[in-house]
């Protein structure tokens, strides 16, 4: 399956070992010029065959690989840089023209109705991209699942709210552009994936950290309709997650006004005319001034979201579908000394509560996991994001000295993830049962 017909035109991919990968498919018009800080617009049809043969630029974000000019870099940042971002082969240029997705499919023809995995990357809503070193679709293709990875606008580019933007919007709102990008990408996949051999009625959205939070947002908005069949939240989505409920409309507008004042722009036209690299520099300076790394977040705006995610779940306003969710042992800086006292990440409790609520509301408890495997090579244990190498099957891309136990766990996790995508169950009942109020079972991944 090297060439596929879509609603926008023909697309040609690259054939690999028994599968085809389509890199850099546009799912929206580039959000540049007058489209900066507007909802994503549909792609115009093209003539001929679009060559989906290379990954595209990442959205504007702080460049953690750049020279820091002598500034002290937090220890955790240097660790994450070594873990994921220091390989030049997987580093990307930055551009506002970044709304692309990638598809790995094992299908040989349209209409095979294979399950679809729709991945949303993490990064605190301010960093990351769709083809990071740890992401790959080969292992999913080998298990009969199509993998889609997407990019979306980040930070200020994806979440700026301001009165100027409210004035030009018919709904008198602004912000949430990154979430709207995710919805546009999901809609594109829903409308086109059957031509790639996928089943549009069996799409599982999943993500880690901000990608998990995004997945929770997508099951909490009416704008995604019936496009989601299942969802997996990894170290992010959960009940009573403050990161999902802390940004109020008033606070978001106030931050937007403060930032725009720092730019010196006197009008929206001036703001949109500013060079992207200059705006990104000002954004990073503003963040340093406020002493907050994550300032620009999705927010309840009355349209994309009418209530926060906790209220959505409590009121039964999330999609009534199968869920799988979990966290890692050392998530959110839980140290070995804390573990000795029995302390777990706040996300752990939130996962249990989520499952109890889905059981209470529609008698369908969720599947909960706890990743406790300590990665070899250093003392970081089961850190935030440690599971990514395993559930993508990309151990060989990592610097760590992985052994037989790691490869066994990798194979197990790929089986759990893809079985859930196929059936709504990660394993047989005797191996992994749902987490119920009367039987709060949690699958240990080690």
Feature-to-residue mapping (PLM):
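Serine-hydrolase-like catalytic core of hydrolytic proteins
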Residues: 82-265, 313-333, 358, 363-364
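Short, solvent-exposed turn/loop segments enriched in Gly/Ser/Thr/Pro and often Arg
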Residues: 153-155, 206-210, 369-378, 432-438
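A structural signal for well-ordered alpha-helical segments within the folded catalytic domains
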Residues: 20, 96-99, 180-183, 187, ...
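C-terminal domain-tail junction helix/linker
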Residues: 437-446
């Amino acid at each position: 399956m090297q060439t596929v017909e879509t609603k926008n035109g023909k697309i040609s991919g690259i054939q690999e070992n028994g599968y085809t990968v389509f890199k850099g498919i546009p799912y929206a018009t580039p959000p540049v010029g007058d489209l900066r800080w507007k909802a994503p617009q549909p792609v115009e049809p093209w003539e001929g065959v679009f060559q989906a043969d290379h990954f595209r630029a990442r959205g504007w974000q702080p460049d953690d690989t750049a020279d820091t000019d002598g500034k002290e870099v937090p220890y955790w940042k240097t660790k994450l840089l070594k873990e994921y971002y220091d390989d030049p082969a997987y580093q990307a240029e930055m551009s506002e023209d970044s709304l692309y997705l990638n598809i790995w499919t094992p299908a040989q023809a349209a209409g095979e109705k294979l399950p679809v995995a729709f991945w949303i990357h993490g990064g605190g809503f301010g960093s990351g991209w769709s083809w990071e070193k740890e992401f790959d679709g080969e292992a999913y293709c080998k298990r009969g699942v199509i993998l889609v990875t997407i990019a979306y606008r980040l930070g200020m580019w994806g979440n700026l709210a301001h009165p100027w933007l409210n004035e030009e919007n018919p709904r008198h709102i602004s912000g949430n552009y990154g979430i709207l990008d995710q919805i546009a990408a999901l809609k594109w996949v829903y409308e086109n994936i059957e031509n790639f051999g996928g089943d549009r009625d069996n799409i599982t959205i999943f993500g880690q950290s901000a990608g998990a939070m995004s997945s929770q947002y997508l099951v909490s908005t009416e704008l995604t309709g019936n496009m989601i069949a299942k969802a997996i939240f990894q170290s992010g989505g959960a009940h009573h997650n403050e990161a999902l409920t802390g940004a109020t409309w008033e606070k978001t507008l106030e931050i937007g006004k403060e930032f725009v004042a720092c730019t010196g722009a006197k009008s929206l036209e001036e703001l949109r005319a500013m060079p992207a690299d200059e705006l990104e520099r000002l954004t990073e300076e503003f963040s340093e001034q406020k002493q907050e790394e994550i300032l620009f977040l999705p927010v309840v705006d009355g349209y994309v979201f009418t209530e926060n995610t906790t209220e959505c779940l409590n009121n039964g306003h999330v999609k009534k579908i199968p869920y799988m969710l979990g966290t890692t042992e050392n998530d959110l800086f839980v140290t070995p000394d804390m573990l000795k006292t029995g302390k777990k990440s706040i996300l752990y409790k939130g996962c249990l509560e989520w499952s109890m609520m889905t059981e209470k509301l529609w008698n369908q408890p969720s599947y909960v996991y706890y990743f406790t495997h300590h990665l070899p090579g250093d003392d970081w244990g089961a850190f935030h994001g440690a599971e990514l190498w395993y559930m993508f099957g990309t151990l060989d891309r990592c610097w760590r000295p992985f052994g037989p136990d790691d490869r066994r766990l990798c194979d197990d996790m790929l089986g759990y993830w893809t079985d859930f995508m196929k059936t709504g169950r990660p394993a047989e009942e005797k191996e992994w049962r749902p987490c119920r109020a009367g039987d709060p079972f949690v699958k240990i991944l080690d």
